[in-house]
A protein has these predicted regions:
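Terpene synthase/cyclase
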Residues: 2-566
Length: 566
């Protein structure tokens, strides 16, 4: 059931009877007393919060440097001039690719769109020009697909031999293999040429590492980085830092000096914005005080903020990040109530109260649930229906657990795409959009296509990483166990099938993220894709949310605290 999970062990839980206050609309104070003697419940020992408010407030927040601001503006115009300078098509593609991987493409959205539109209009001629250039063809294909332009996999047919297979000699070109590999992960359903290209490129890149075919350490690093995770699946902000530092290490990197300096300054300036936001939401969370009153739940304010940076890192999306962080905190707390602490009777009452969204309906709830409902009610009143849907999905899984029921795989996944909280997340992204219009509001129901595979991917990533720990505490059977029981296969086979399901759902996402009719639709689809990428980061090989030390702590430092050296 868990959106985020942790390793568990028995926990002795007791509340002092002390008042707890929740402030509503800055004027009304709603008061509730914490319960004195809880019922017999399941419990968990979660790792403690690593980022208390004192630690966050101690972080150095750089004051705005007018000299640095002026330098950023100057470099931005220099880069814009470089974009508009006459250049060969391959140089143009390389520049656009660098703008995206360096994390500064958002400054030049219109310039990039105009350039790609021009290239797309001449696609047939350019493809002929690149008849022997696999690297350039693959970059062209990837950039067009990534930015919503229609381009067929047929662009790679010219690299096949008389038997219809990719020519073996192509494997000797590591740069071409890297570009083909990255392009292949933008495949859609039933694109066999791209599927074969993915297998071909993967095999040859593995040989590069295993047989020492490349003498350059940096080239081997790039190959290992790609094989660990393709660009299309990576959390953008994490890759941006890696790519900037990779360009710094590579003396011969073919990156414009002004562009690289601009990318470093922009990264650090954006990080300062994030740091200030983190301090603000940390103060809100501390003053709210609910984490102290409900200690059975995971306290993950900083990690919840990191999720939002993965979804929309640009400074202009500050309001979304702040409000979504608050929602993430409540999702975690509600998830732990359903997974760990609440009795079935209490959960049914709580679900009904959330569904009714009536402040007068809380009298029948136990005191700890009153606290939780009031916190959610006072903070997130805009997304009422989505919170109700989430709690209903949680309740379904709670009933499965209490009845000892193992659902069919499809039944589990259908409910799981709701209990993973995707709809709550996307609703916040929708409501906090910068360019939201009445027309966009009227079209809200027009975006379900990309949401279905997105929600399934989130559930699959979560279950693959957290199921072992959750089952140890006696949680409901996960998709792996449902698959094992229904199909009569081993856990290893079931996990393999889940990984194939991940690829299949990514193909659906790629098919649904094509052409857009407005900047708002473009923003929403990009937000959804970035949500998937961030889920992948938090559940890559292990539960990096529940076990918040290790890699997650490292990336908090990398993205939110330590600036790039200039």
């Amino acid at each position: 059931m868990a959106l985020f999970a942790a390793s568990l062990a028995p926990l002795n839980l007791s509340f002092d009877r002390r008042p707890f206050f929740l402030r509503r609309c800055a004027t009304t104070v709603i008061r509730c007393a914490a319960e004195k003697t809880p019922a017999s419940r399941r419990s968990a020992i979660y790792q403690p919060n690593l980022w208390g408010d004192d630690r966050i407030r101690s972080l150095t927040v750089e004051e705005e440097d007018r000299t640095a601001t002026a330098r950023i503006k100057l470099l931005k115009e220099k880069v814009r001039k470089v974009i508009h300078d006459d250049k060969e098509v391959e140089e143009q593609l390389q520049l656009i690719d660098q703008l995206q991987q360096l994390g500064v493409a958002y400054h030049f959205k219109d310039d990039i769109k105009d350039s790609l539109s021009s290239l797309h209009a001449s696609l047939e001629d350019i493809s002929l020009k690149f008849k022997d250039n696999l690297h350039a063809s693959a970059v062209l294909f990837r950039l067009l697909r990534e930015n919503g332009f229609s381009v067929s996999e047929d662009i790679f047919y010219k690299f096949r031999d008389e038997k219809g297979q990719l020519r073996d000699c192509l494997g000797k070109n590591t740069q071409g293999m890297l570009s083909l590999y990255e392009a292949s992960y933008y495949e859609k359903d039933e694109e066999m040429a791209l599927h074969e290209a993915m297998e071909f490129a993967t095999e040859h890149l593995k040989n590069v590492l295993e047989e020492g075919m490349e003498s350059s350490d940096l080239t081997r690093e790039k190959v290992a980085h790609a094989l660990e995770l393709p660009l299309n699946w990576r959390m953008e902000r994490l890759h941006t830092r890696w790519f900037i530092e990779s360009c710094q290490r590579e003396a011969a990197a073919n990156v414009n000096r002004a562009l690289l300096e601009f990318a470093k300054l922009d990264f650090n300036a954006t990080q300062s914005v994030h740091k200030k936001e983190l301090r603000q939401v940390s103060r809100w969370w501390t003053e709210l005080g609910i984490a102290r009153e409900l200690p059975f739940s995971r306290d993950r304010l900083t990690e919840n903020y990191l999720w939002t940076v993965g979804w929309a890192s640009e400074p202009e999306h500050w309001r979304f990040r702040e409000e979504q962080t608050k929602a993430n905190c409540f999702v975690t707390m509600i998830d732990d109530v359903y997974d760990v602490y609440g009795t079935l009777d209490e959960l049914e009452l709580f679900t009904d109260t959330i569904d009714r969204w009536d402040i007068n309906a809380i009298d029948g709830l136990p005191d700890y649930m009153k606290l939780l409902f009031l916190a959610v009610f006072n903070t997130t009143n805009e997304a009422t229906l989505k919170w109700a849907d989430l709690c209903k999905a949680y309740l379904v899984e709670a009933k499965w657990y209490h009845k000892g029921h193992t659902p069919k795989f499809d039944e589990y996944l259908e409910n799981g795409r709701m209990s993973i909280s995707s709809n709550v997340m996307v609703t916040y992204g929708y409501c906090m959009a910068q360019e939201l219009t009445k027309h966009d509001l009227e079209r809200f129901s027009d975006y379900p296509a990309i949401m279905l595979p997105k929600s399934r991917l989130a559930r699959l990533y979560d279950d693959l990483a957290t199921s072992k720990d959750e089952l140890k505490r006696g949680d409901v059977q996960k998709c792996i166990q449902c698959c094992m029981l229904e199909r009569g296969v081993s856990e290893d086979v079931a996990r393999g099938q889940m990984k194939e399901a991940i690829k299949a759902n990514w193909r659906s996402v790629n098919g649904d993220r094509g052409s857009v009719s407005s900047s708002f639709e473009e923003y929403m689809k990009r937000l959804v894709v970035n949500m998937i990428r961030t889920f992948q980061f938090f559940y890559q090989d292990e539960d990096r949310y529940g076990k918040a030390d290790g890699e997650t702590e490292n990336q908090v430092f990398s993205l939110l605290i330590n600036p790039i050296l200039l």
